[in-house]
Amino acid sequence: MARIGDGGDLLKCSFCGKSQKQVKKLIAGPGVYICDECIDLCNEIIEEELADADDVKLDELPKPVEIREFLEGYVIGQDTAKRTLAVAVYNHYKRIQAGEKSRDSRCEAVELTKSNILMLGPTGCGKTYLAQTLAKMLNVPFAIADATALTEAGYVGEDVENILLKLIQAADYDVKRAETGIIYIDEVDKIARKSENPSITRDVSGEGVQQALLKILEGTQASVPPQGGRKHPHQEFIQIDTTNVLFIVAGAFAGLEKIIYERVGKRGLGFGAEVRSKAEIDTTDHFAEVMPEDLIKFGLIPEFIGRLPVVASVTNLDKESLVKILSEPKNALVKQYTRLFEMDGVELEFTDDALEAIADQAIHRGTGARGLRAIMEEVLLPVMYDIPSRDDVAKVVVTKETVQDNVLPTIVPRKPSRSERRDKSA
């Protein structure tokens, strides 16, 4: 047992040799002692090793082709958006690693600035789902925020720093990991200012929020309230550097296509000019021709657009794509509902024309892929109510008439077993 002096009254740390008077705390074990300073040192060593293990290694990071292939398994269509996201994420971590190498070598190197992403496209076409699916693949902190809840500092609503808090929480409050994470800001079109011209009055949920987002998009040392909510002077803040945080902002931008058409339509003037009808533009990807001036006219400020150099657009989903979404992805809706019915011992089947009818309804409602689940819930509600209470059903078949004419699905009765037939005859 570690003791000091002839009397052996003072105990000492078995690792550093300091006496109990030289340290704040001495913890005893079976025949050994350890002081608080040695415990702190051990914790630091463990944290450093864990941090090194969590760092994204370039050779371990999926290549753009691999990222796109993973997205293909869950998201139908939107090939351009998949490629853009895959390249942006890969380059984001290459840039971070290049910065770390230049700091280690202490030599003058080319500074690589980040390229945040703006995603445009109609509602229900997969913008949010693409980001959520991407999060499954990457071992990095990932947070999704809603721009509609944000207001300028000092007004009722959420500060922009609360977006960073979600990222810190996703990293289990490991600020170092959070500083290399990804933030997806949805509904960014809702913070467009109310008119193209700068307003004299304050626009606290529009232009004011855009101004507040500028610094964290570009890269700054932000102070984040650890419990969220508004800042007040009598609280400690979490400091986070957003220089290496990749931002993906997205919105439906309803009405932007008209602005694009007005600009593109002006090309059809004079002899030999190519004249395209509005229908021709609308049937293709009208967001593919977006220019910064279109976004400014929509209501985004030039400084905000300048911090989003990469623009990716998603297109309206046609009938064929919606049918594929229903049945082909790994977690397709048909597979999900089939599994639900299997748990009750019943087989579920959709005919091909039933899937087409569901896709037609989604197009008619204008809800895109997001509306498919609601339609299927309506179609299956009667049988999902009855089936759990019945033991005579083997199969449920959903047809085109079930979807279009509110006809009940076809019920295929279960054949009684030999013992049941014997009991019945007895």
From Swiss-Prot:
GO terms for cellular component: HslUV protease complex. The keyword Chaperone applies. It comes from the Bacteria. Zn(2+) binds at C13, C16, C35, C38. It holds the Pfam family zf-C4_ClpX. The keyword Transport does not apply. ATP binds at P122, T123, G124, C125, G126, K127, T128, Y129. Gene3D superfamilies: 1.10.8.60, ClpX chaperone, C4-type zinc finger domain, P-loop containing nucleotide triphosphate hydrolases. GO terms for biological process: cell division; proteolysis involved in protein catabolic process. Residues 1-54 form the ClpX-type ZB domain. GO terms for molecular function: ATP binding; ATP hydrolysis activity; ATP-dependent protein folding chaperone; protein dimerization activity; unfolded protein binding; zinc ion binding. Keywords: ATP-binding, Chaperone, Metal-binding, Nucleotide-binding, Zinc. Component of the ClpX-ClpP complex. Forms a hexameric ring that, in the presence of ATP, binds to fourteen ClpP subunits assembled into a disk-like structure with a central cavity, resembling the structure of eukaryotic proteasomes. ATP-dependent specificity component of the Clp protease. It directs the protease to specific substrates. Can perform chaperone functions in the absence of ClpP. Belongs to the ClpX chaperone family. HAMAP family: ClpX. This is ATP-dependent Clp protease ATP-binding subunit ClpX. The lineage of its organism: Bacteria, Bacillati, Actinomycetota, Actinomycetes, Mycobacteriales.
